[in-house]
């Protein structure tokens, strides 16, 4: 049985002259906007995005979020774990147990190689007596370590793949666009490989829009927003955020800054590589099994970070069971994954990565909210269709 306080999905019932404030409140409640309001929202957000650089500068403190994939109720949990939405509303306690992992806990190159740390995670997410106290202590730890960050107003960088596969792609994207419209300087939406016309026609977002509106006009408006999403973000000039990875055509950040981004994602080239590439155990470059982008190795990452004076490349794009993963011994590439129990069947943890002014990453891990904390659409696609 679903808790009656849980946001119930459905169409928003707003006056015709409603604006961003009303849209945001409706979006928080898992309501999708009318066709008219959604198109207005897309135009507002598009105007802000047109002014952004291909690599948008962002100041610390920052919360970096990975793939969401239409998992609306887990996105709400992400905000609870992160201390609240950018609107400054009072943060709720997480519905699931969470853990805080700092860079001091990590032994390269594996994500979690320390047996003590593995035990810590196992104990944190195991349903044991006293777990509530454990969760509270974790929150105390994170709140005390981040109190200065709260005062400075935390920024959010989302690394793309907001839609497809999950049950509520439209509502998820609507909430993020509303936050962008209301707080344009505090929310950065990076483009992922799923923010494209071709991919969304295959993996669910197009079909969802058509089902809810009876036509494709809102989907088209959202795709125009996708075209203006930034290709990356740079935190305090030292931490690069992209969806996928690096490109053999890109050696410097200035080369990214001059890429023509206001278009559908090309099938090859630098733009394509930024949203499709993956780090892997290769020396330099290798052909990607995805059919787009490249696999890049530690030598490539080391050189790119050296040339561009970077301490870290934060990216998403790949499911990692423990919520995040460092890929190389130098710990200069990390995957952040923010869709727990991906496709409602993978059983994985999720994380957000918090970067303070010392530029040391702290990971907050969380799991999917329980069934009584979410709604499931009656006419939902079969899970096998989405697990592609």
UniProtKB/Swiss-Prot annotation:
Alphabetical list of SMART domains matching this protein: PP2Ac
InterPro entries: Calcineurin-like_PHP_ApaH (IPR004843), Metallo-depent_PP-like (IPR029052), PPA2-like (IPR047129), Ser/Thr-sp_prot-phosphatase (IPR006186)
Enzyme Commission number(s): 3.1.3.16
Sequence positions that bind Mn(2+) 1: 67, 69, 161
GO CC term, one of those recorded: cytoplasm
Gene3D superfamilies per record: 3.60.21.10
Keywords annotated in UniProt: Hydrolase, Manganese, Metal-binding, Virulence
Class of the enzyme per the UniProt entry, highest EC level: hydrolase
Superkingdom field: Eukaryota
Cofactor list: Mn(2+)
Protein family (similarity comment): Belongs to the PPP phosphatase family. PP-6 (PP-V) subfamily.
Protein name (record): Serine/threonine-protein phosphatase sitA
Gene name of the record: sitA
């Amino acid at each position: 049985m679903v808790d009656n306080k849980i946001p119930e999905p459905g169409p928003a019932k707003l006056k015709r002259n409603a604006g961003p404030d009303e849209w945001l409140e409706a979006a928080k409640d898992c309501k999708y906007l009318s066709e008219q309001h959604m198109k207005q929202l897309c135009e507002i957000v598009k105007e802000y995005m047109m002014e952004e650089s291909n690599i948008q500068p962002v100041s610390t403190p920052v919360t970096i979020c990975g793939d969401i994939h239409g998992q609306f109720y887990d996105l709400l949990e992400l905000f609870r774990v992160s201390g609240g939405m950018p609107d400054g509303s009072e943060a709720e306690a997480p519905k699931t147990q969470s853990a805080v992992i700092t860079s001091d806990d990590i032994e390269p190159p594996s994500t979690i190689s320390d047996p003590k740390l593995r035990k810590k995670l196992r104990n944190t997410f195991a349903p044991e007596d006293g777990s509530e106290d454990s969760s509270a202590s974790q929150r105390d730890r994170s709140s005390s370590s981040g109190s200065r960050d709260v005062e400075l107003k935390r920024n959010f960088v989302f690394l793309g793949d907001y839609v497809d596969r999950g049950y509520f792609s439209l509502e998820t994207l609507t909430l993020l666009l509303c936050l962008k419209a209301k707080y344009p300087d505090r929310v950065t939406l990076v483009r992922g490989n799923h923010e494209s016309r071709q991919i969304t026609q295959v993996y669910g977002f197009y079909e969802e829009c058509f089902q809810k509106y009876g036509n494709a006009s809102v989907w088209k408006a959202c795709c125009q927003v996708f075209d203006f999403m930034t290709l990356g973000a740079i935190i305090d000039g030292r931490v690069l955020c992209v969806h996928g990875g690096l490109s053999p055509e890109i050696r410097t950040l200035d080369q990214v800054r001059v890429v023509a981004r206001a278009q559908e994602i090309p099938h090859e080239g630098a733009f394509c590589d930024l949203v499709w590439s993956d780090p892997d155990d290769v020396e330099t470059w290798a052909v990607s099994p995805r059919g787009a982008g490249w696999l890049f190795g530690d030598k490539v990452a080391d050189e790119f970070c050296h040339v561009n004076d970077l301490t870290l490349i934060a990216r998403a794009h790949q499911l990692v069971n423990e919520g995040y993963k460092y890929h190389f011994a130098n710990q200069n590439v990390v995957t952040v994954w923010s869709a727990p129990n991906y496709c409602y069947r993978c059983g994985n943890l999720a994380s957000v990565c918090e970067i303070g002014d010392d530029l040391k990453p702290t990971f907050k891990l969380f799991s999917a909210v329980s069934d009584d904390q979410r709604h499931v659409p009656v006419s939902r696609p079969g899970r096998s269709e989405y697990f592609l």
